[in-house]
Amino acid sequence: MKRSYFLALAALTLCGGLHAQDIYKVESLSGSDLNGTARFVGMGGAMSALGADISTMGSNPAAIGMFRRSDVAFTASATIQPNGTTMADIEKARGSFDQAGFVYACKLGKSGLKFFNMGFNYQKRRNFKNYIANLGVPTLDGMSQSWQMMDLAHYNGRPLDLRPESPDCDYTTPLTLIGYDTQMIAPIYNDKNELTGYSPSFANSYSYRRAQWGGIRQYDFNLSMNWEDQVYAGLTIGVYDVDMHTETDYSEILVDNNNQTDIYRMTNSEILEGTGVDVKLGIILRPIEESPFRLGFSVSTPIFYDLSQHSYLYMCSPYDYTDKEGTTHPYTEADGETGIDYRIRSPWRFNLSMGTTVGNYLALGAEYEVAHSKGAQVRYPEYDDYDGYTTQSKRDRALDHEIDACLKAVHTFRIGAEARLARGVFGRIGYNYVSAPFKKNAFLNLFTDSPSYAYSTNTDYVNLGAINRITAGLGFRGKHFYADATYQYQAQQGDVYAFHVAEDDGITNRLQAQKVDLNRHNVMFTIGYKF
């Protein structure tokens, strides 16, 4: 395929605002799934005031103070995304070991400080497994990912010289440089051999597939106390392990001015790994001695993540080229790798909960939680030249602006009930709502002064909508052993954009969003022993 197009159309892509990196990583590392023991999930997670479940260690540490017997529990699950498929050897259904923990209840006396409890719990905080596919999507006016590459090939109103030896290469992204190397954008020179701009490619459709897997594993260490069965207080220190993999396969049907078509393809692989730590404090009050009603409050500090990201980008265009030996090749391909270390601080979280029991046959719980996005930060370590170790970091003010412009406070509502159906048999039902984390016109901004700009290898982004979860379960209790089973249905939609071509306002994407369903089914089982 020859590199010749109607250059007059290129003016359509020269848009106003130009922008940079990754608020989407901040959201991924700030949110959490509804996970834990099957009993906890079966009640929609609304157990922070009711307490006496190992998984409440992560939502209100004081709830562990309600244990009167020691406890150990293990949970496994299976998750299915109905519209998923196999990609990168990741199946649509996958099993998971989701929880393992214990509580040691230490009785101190019959009055005053009655119990001092200690506990540990592992659970999967977030399961990143999902699959998105938009195949054969028509584009308007020949829009192509290369249009965004062309925008990125300009800085302060002038075209950048993208030849390998040029210092201008420091002012754009690896994506743009590889797009230039594969002729997806071609330089335009005037009669004086001066660079005046770039010509993009044109497409009549695109196909986009993305698979993600991995997760965030949470390890909680808890100390809690019970004062007179009326005041419960607790402290939890959380340690987090991040393992996130993303594989993207993108292609376009390109068309030239002779209506000849051929295929452009891009693949992007990304691995994000790291650790994090936070502190959670909680209190539960039973204000009326004769009443089982309880009121709880907890606060979670930001999770302080220390992360390493590695990306590999490959492009192959249908444009032929002739090498130095005079051999003509029918296509052009190029690749590149990037890596960056950075730190993320998730938002603060505040939780207000209430719960009560009716006799020995009904338990009711409800709670509200909020995480304010303005507390989130991205920072970069400042390494010592001598030993490479550092505790110092520099805040990314450019991404602070993006967080404020694109992310919203996330509100979570949980309600749940447990009823005694027969001796030792319990039924549970719950509902869980999480508000959308992104504002209406949020987008992946690839033009800021953020240091992350130099490591950007993707143009796609997904604006996630609100989450609705419905849960139901059964539990069986013996003198020591217990077993629980829960089904969870999660409904969520998102708007998928393969790339961003801005309108005159510099924000709104001209590329039409593609709706995607990220619904999933989850079945989990817990076995435990009290002693």
What annotation goes with each model-predicted range?
Residues 66, 80-85, 127-130, 244:
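Short active-site-adjacent helix-start/loop capping segments
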Residues 79, 90-91, 467-469:
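Strand-loop-strand
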Residues 41-55, 86-89, 206-212:
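Asp/Glu-centered strand-loop micro-motifs enriched in Gly/Pro and often flanked by an aromatic residue
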